[in-house]
């Protein structure tokens, strides 16, 4: 072995390479000169073959003279002495001529026999028949395939130490997969197809691989610019007698070494996908779509394994003797593998093949028709029901199970059959008589769908159109159509007082009619609308502005002077009330519960998504013939939200919680299919994007979202970082206490009793920890979960204005301040040391005294905490100008700047500023008033009866007050504020759905101007992490049923991310 190659090959590696050779061949190879070895440079073989440069080196050196002497004589007789079948025989067995070539000087013993067998097995003809590549030592008369004579016969220069060509490599060359074709196959194969998944291994980027072109590649470009090494040379073409389709001519490149049989067999059994350890260059990362999808599936499984392992570690690590060290090792291994897989898959590129692997059929464009709603066959649904097994197999248990199963199948069958006459999107109802405005097409279709739904059981459904698509006007049109007598004949012939629940539960009726606490039968009424308080006047305003006079009468049932008897409510066509009033009157069953309503409408029905709440229980007990739920988000937290709506609709038997959990919400594919059937038959949902893509909502203007990033100034950032440091410390203490609390609970449980050694040694580590936890639990310094949330609140308020934390503490915690009733009498304080108490108390100006006072009610502060407290002594005091509310913060300045330069500068544009805190809106109002900007305010302090007047005043084009300060909770739902086309979100909320509802106050049907949403975010703060949390929640949207967003609740992982831990 030469010194140049010594750094690449060791003796062990050399032995492993030639391990498959016989002993005699090894002895012959050892007598080869070093110069002969260096003269043989490795060359690639056909696609997928691993090249071994040590193969046949002795044959090339020993038979070179013999081959040269016999080449001329044999070439003259090759045409006359061989037939096509002889050539075929040579392709599958060793050549007789080659078997007789024996090098001189080799003794004829047992080793010679092994050498002869080795030569037969590795003869050029054998390798030619297997690989389809002509070896260099095969003379011209051995095959009838024409080869180019441009192959370099002489030796090449030995590679230097700096540029040594390794024996094995894992690199592809260029876009070789676009030009390679499989050469290993049946003898009677046709023109070979592209082998896009071949695992081609080329020895070096500096070498030219073999180019094998089919007969159809005449016009293909042979010089690939992005390929490594010299360009390909076009080989001459001829037809092989072994291929009836005309197999392409194979031209070998320069400096090729011959493949081995083992390498060929290895390639025949190797997978189509490239091995991850072999991919290094960009061109090697081209894979088929099937391989890419399979790798993505494996990556998803790996992520699930990592997540499961982490959850297992959190639950059982503290219970194990090794404290979960083995599980942690497994987690580390999985994380490393996951990181490698992600890095590898990110570099993959799906190959765009010109020849499709399967036949692609373009769908024919049919005339528009109603979409197929029934995607499941009834046999599949019924079989899925039969898969559920009873829990109790006794006589009573089986009877109950069979009864539930029969009711479930009957109800599903009715819903499945009802889909047969479901009106398609092209079915539109006429505008009812007395309506001043014309309905849009999607509203007309909703009116037709509602008329169809009221003829089925249950009578009613869920209108889940996107926010701002006119659900209120659609329902008013339905009420007007009912009064005009435009209902179907089934509705006229039926008893208007029949209740869907009464149809299913006859036992609830007595002979004399419906009885409740000894009073007479309830009275027949019109339509009851239950909505949030902020929408009371909007319903009244919609009826007055959209319906002709005297067509519909409206009563707002709200306030202390509302009617207390139902007989005074039955004469109105529409009675509007709130969820709070219904829940209050539910206790005495008065007023609204004394009327049997023709129609009950729940506006913003997601308010009652908790089926255990008082409002949900109250609305479910209301009596009515038709029951409707209006909501843009039927699911906000979980699938159980749908159960609350089905309970209100009285969709038997799924309005029973036990039946719901057993047959619907059972985490199975069958349960999901049954839920889909319920939603397809009971719910109608259209989004703005869907209607715009279908061309049915061309009147809606464009919507633009702008993210405004703000950097806090130096003073504000100092305050923020100080509070953040304390917050992280307190949160870490909270996590520590939480972990110890779980350990203590495990100690108390029977399944986790202390061991004998622990009992024997009462001073062990476990008991020390337990005593420490008991002392901590008994002290006043235990951190509660609400303390953590309050800290997050303080951090978010600092982003809006640092003065909010002082004002909030001074306002809300004034009762704990003792005699300090005014700012002038209150001494300087250390907010950091007292922040966890959420109160303002006396502290000394000396830092050490401050630390001592902080420890009066608990353990003293740690040295680090004392140092931080001392450093922040002057920073977190009222005398700091940053807490002055008259000083505009960075965010307030940016809001004022945008209002002046981008919005108010226009002649008629209006803006709405939304915030979660009215204190922020008050600060902004004061600064705007100094600049002469008049504003309107709508928040929780405004009486409900006056809120609609403020909305009407703001929507008036002639009104000069062009800025509305809106509270997110008071006015973020249901209001129609299309008078403005700019919305400024001052602060970010955990639940992005609330922000989306606020945006739809201006982006709704009737808006004529382009809408611009401004979202303000302070960078390098908790707001930036909240933005990431919002994006994650939006990515987890449940689009199967409604497209609604996931829960707004914060988890421990969310809190860790917010605190940067």
Curated annotation (Swiss-Prot):
Motif stretch (DEAH box): 603-606
EC number from the UniProt entry: 3.6.4.-
Biased composition (Low complexity): 32-46
Polar residues: bias regions: 237-253
Biased composition, class Basic residues, residue ranges: 506-522
Domain Helicase ATP-binding: 452-652
A GO cellular component entry from the record: cytoplasm
Similarity comment: family membership: Belongs to the SNF2/RAD54 helicase family.
Reported function: DsDNA-dependent ATPase which acts as a transcription termination factor by coupling ATP hydrolysis with removal of RNA polymerase II from the DNA template.
Protein's name in the database: Transcription termination factor 2
Native source species: Drosophila melanogaster
High-level lineage: Eukaryota, Metazoa, Ecdysozoa, Arthropoda, Hexapoda
